[in-house]
Amino acid sequence: MSRRRGPRRRGPRRRPRPGAPAVPRPGAPAVPRPGALPTADSQMVPAYDSGTAVESAPAASSLLRRWLLVPQADDSDDADYAGNDDAEWANSPPSEGGGKAPEAPHAAPAAACPPPPPRKERGPQRPLPPHLALRLRTTTEYLARLSLRRRRPPASPPADAPRGKVCFSPRVQVRHLVAWETAARLARRGSWARERADRDRFRRRVAAAEAVIGPCLEPEARARARARARAHEDGGPAEEEEAAAAARGSSAAAGPGRRAV
């Protein structure tokens, strides 16, 4: 069974901190702060008569006394006031500022601004370390040579110079590729080099086999083989001895390097 909760109690309202700006309530008339600049919403008009300023304005709000004008019921017509405007300004006594325009209330006096600090004279510069000085010098020389090379017109070849087989465009850039020595050698030789090595190896093996099998394929070796086969079929010991003697004689005639089969 769920517990029933009563109405939520609200705690005490937080009081604004001292010195925090007051937030105006919605719908309340906006009151300009002392020293604030006039805005488009306030529609302030300069007061030509200091006596018509708002008397209820605080003493610290000099902006309201200077700019705010409250119209009265017994004001004369605008046309009459406009006609006497030049005469009133001509007969009006000079202001306290000596004819100068009044300074804005928000503008700070010139005496209040602190003078700019005097510039410190730079002393003699410290010498650079050797490696930095060398690098600076080489960089300066390189930039000077580069600028001189850019200013100099490109050298054109003479007319009687022999023309090469290949003419590169000035836009072509040649970049040297770095390759391993083995890869470069194989690229120069190609696949035919390996095929030639294989053919040489096969030729040597065939020659070695012919040196061993060649004596067995000669006519004399074949005749001895036939005689030995007949003697074996007949079974006579005399014929076997003759075949063995003939084989020994043929091996002696062939030489020590050859072997009779």
From Swiss-Prot:
Motif (Bipartite nuclear localization signal): 188-206
UniProt biased composition (Pro residues): 18-32
Membrane-spanning residues: none
Cellular component terms per the entry's GO annotation: host cell cytoplasm; host cell nucleolus; virion component
Residue ranges with Basic residues bias: 1-17
Binding to PP1CA: region residues: 163-176
Localization terms from the record: Host cytoplasm; Host nucleus, Host nucleolus; Virion
GO molecular function, one term: protein serine/threonine phosphatase inhibitor activity
Region (Interaction with host EIF2S1/EIF-2ALPHA): 206-221
Keyword set includes Repeat: yes
InterPro entries documented for this protein: PPP1R15 (IPR051254)
Sequence segments annotated as region (Disordered): 1-59, 75-135, 145-164, 223-261
Protein's GO biological process: response to endoplasmic reticulum stress; symbiont-mediated suppression of host autophagy; symbiont-mediated suppression of host innate immune response; symbiont-mediated suppression of host translation initiation; symbiont-mediated suppression of host type I interferon-mediated signaling pathway
Span list, region Important for interferon resistance: 178-261
Placement of sequence motif Nuclear export signal: 128-137
Presence of keyword Repeat: yes
Sequence ranges of Acidic residues compositional bias: 75-88
Anything else known: ICP34.5 is detected as early as 3 hpi prior to viral replication but reaches maximal levels late in infection. ICP34.5 gene is therefore classified as gamma-1 or leaky late gene.
Function: Plays essential roles in viral nuclear egress to mediate capsid transit across the nuclear membrane and also in the inhibition of host immune response and integrated stress response (ISR). Facilitates nuclear egress cooperatively with host C1QBP and protein kinase C/PKC to induce lamin A/C phosphorylation and subsequent reorganization. In turn, lamina disassembles and nuclear egress occurs.
Name by which UniProt lists this protein: Neurovirulence factor ICP34.5
Source species of the chain: Human herpesvirus 2 (strain HG52)
